[in-house]
Every structure is written in C-alpha cells, then in structure tokens.
Amino acid sequence: LVDGVNEKGLSAAALYFSGEAQFAKQAEAGKANIAPHEVLNWILGNAVSCEDLGNQLANLNIVAAPVKLMGISVPLHWIITDRSGACYVLEVVADGAHYIKNPVGVMTNSPDFGWHLKNLSNYTQLKPTPHPARDYDGFQVNSFGPGSGALGLPGDYTSVSRFIRTVFMREYTDQVSTDQTVTQMSHILNSVEIPKGVKIKKDGTEDYTQYRGYMDTQNSIYYMQPYDDQTIYRVALTEDLMNKDQPTEFPIQEKQQFKAFN
C-alpha cells in the first residue's frame, strides 16, 4: 500500500526519499517494528488523526528490511492529512525520526522536507497577476500580459521544481466543493505529471507518473486516475467494505475510455 484513507478520515501517502532515508538496522523490544513499506498500513490501521499518530510514533521503530517485490529496503517518507485539515510529514533520517507540521500541504521526493520549505524563499516573486510596467530612464516596458507573474516558475521534472509548481498551483487555484475539487486537483497535478519518455533514469528505464490518487478525508473516498486511462475512478469506504474479511479488488481499464457522440 502506498496511499489511502481510513474510516476516520486520516489519509497518507508514501513517496520516494532516496539518498535521505535512514532506517533502524535492528528491531527494538517493546516497540512496533515494521519495514518502511509497511508503515502506511500501520498508520491507517492504528491512527485516527495527525495528532493521534504523533502521540504513537514513540512506539514505532521503522527497520530497514527489503520488500520482496523489489529486493531492497525502500527509501520512503510520508505525508499525512486528517479530517480537520491538519497535515504532517514523517521522515526518518540520520539523526532520527521527524514528524513535521506541513504548512503548505505539499510533498514530493528528496531532499528533506525542511530543505523544500527553505527553497520557497527563492520564489516569493511568483503571483497570478501580471507584473506592473517598468520605467527604464524614460523608456516604459510592459509585461506580455496575464501569466507574467509566474515567470520564473520552474518547469522541469525534478522533485524540487515539482514542489514549487504544486505549492504555487495549490495556493492560487479557485476553492471549490468536493466533486469539483477532484477535477481541480487533476488540473493541478497536470502541471507535474511526468509523461513516458521525458524522464530517463541512469539505467535507461523510464520514470513516469503511473497514476494519480485523490483522497476525500471528509467522506473517506478514494479517487484514482491511471496513466493509461484518464477516467477518474471512485471508491467509497462503506460499511459493507469495512465488514468484509477479504480484500476487495476493483478492476480498472488499461486503455483510454472515450465517450463517443456518433
């Protein structure tokens, strides 16, 4: 499990934190000892809010242990949000675990979250309105109109630039209701989605956005938008689902669906 929401409206997502994450090498007696890839399940299965999670973290020990699918201990950090709107980031680095209040509601990958917050200082000039005209020794220069306030917004696919873009988009997009919010979030994440072929790793493999997940903490609803089909799928955490004793799978399409008019 890499993201999800529980019946109390607590949501969490695990993101890659390569080069930064440093987990315990051994288990500790009297603590919940789990691997990095098990943390999200533990969070959603044990906590009801961000505050509640913070109170339980002293009893958690994240141990470097490989996931069978990959054969490695996955370097991860986590973003957690609850029904009150509180948002936190959990990172485990060389000097221990850090549970950090997230004032911007955004997280990407490495570097550490504190670095990303400091880097925002380089982009305080960004705004949704045009820059005013300037006078250079009597020569008046006008901006090229709407959109000029975002000049300098980084456009590459690094985690650093994606963080800046998402913070900017989140800050200035219109505030809307739940169903509209999902559509709004889809538009926001369009700006940071990585298409196949534009980001190649050192080993020659592609890094791309396999899917987007949207979580409604008020109603415990999960929305998924896969790469190969931009249809948004919706699953509500109903009483019926919670009472099942076996996992329930919901199939999604592997090719883009179209609404044909003729």
Roles of regions detected by a PLM:
Residues L1-K31, N59-L60, A64, P251-Q253:
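A contiguous strand-loop segment
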Residues S11-A14, I79-T81, V89, Y214:
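Structural recognition of the beta-strand scaffold that forms the well-ordered cores
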Residues S18-E20, D95-A97, D228-I232:
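Short, surface-exposed beta-strand-loop junctions and turns on beta-sheet-rich folds
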Residues Q22-F23, Y88-E91, H98-N102, N109-S110, ...:
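Short helix/loop capping segments that flank catalytic or ligand/cofactor-binding pockets
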Residues G30, I34-L60, F168-I194:
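Alpha/propeptide regions of enzymes that mature by internal proteolysis
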Residues C50, G54-E91:
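Aromatic- and glycine-enriched pocket-lining scaffold segments that form the walls
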Residues P66, V74, R83, M107-N262:
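C-terminus-biased signal that marks the final domain/tail of proteins
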